[in-house]
Amino acid sequence: MEIFKPINEKKAKGKVKKIFSEIKKTRKITKIPNFWKSIAHNPPLLERTWNSLKAIMKDGALDAVTKELIYVAVSITNSCGYCTRSHTFAAKKKGATDQMIKEMIDVVGIANQNNKLVEAYQVEVDKIYK
């Protein structure tokens, strides 16, 4: 259960209302997701987070689908169900296929498993990797 009730989009004012409008336009959505409505209790945090997300998630050396898949991978590893679902949705909207998502999940699984094995066995890093 949330700590703070998400801000009602229709009751948003000032900077929050402006950012909500930009989020909807940029993400091509009609309703503000609960994440944004929840952090809107702290308008400077809302603004900073939105600006950072826009800057980082835009196309660059990595395309938008790849960035969304990375976001999903990190969210799975961090056990953030909300972020996993919302960014899987975003990845699909940007062109990710079910097969791409399945393969990414396989990579997350094997990476997490092998990371834990390396730590458990205290494997020394090979000279070639240093």
Give the label of every model feature segment.
Residues 1-130:
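Hydrophobic alpha-helical segments
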